Curated annotation (Swiss-Prot):
PANTHER family: COLD SHOCK DOMAIN CONTAINING PROTEINS. Induction: In response to low temperature. GO terms for biological process: regulation of gene expression. The lineage of its organism: Bacteria, Bacillati, Bacillota, Bacilli, Bacillales. This is Cold shock protein CspD. InterPro entries: Cold_shock_CspA, Cold_shock_domain, CSD, CSD_CS, CSP_DNA-bd, NA-bd_OB-fold. One of its GO terms (cellular component) is cytoplasm.
């Protein structure tokens, strides 16, 4: 697992990006967010996640809010 901070997240479109210190930003889709109910992230929120190879490159998986 890796830690990062939410750079931005668009609730209407259901995706955004996570900043990783010393690395490239990682795409995140709402389906990758762990937990029940409405799945959303807030700008600046700390998260833990795994990186997997998606159709268009690296993306976050198993995203957990810290």
């Amino acid at each position: 697992m890796q830690n990062g901070k939410v750079k931005w997240f668009n609730n209407e479109k259901g995706f955004g990006f996570i900043e990783v210190e010393g690395g490239d930003d990682v795409f995140v889709h709402f389906t990758a967010i762990e937990g029940d109910g409405y799945k959303s992230l807030e700008e600046g929120q700390e998260v833990s996640f795994e990186i997997v190879e998606g159709n268009r490159g690296p993306q976050a998986s198993n995203v957990v809010k810290l």
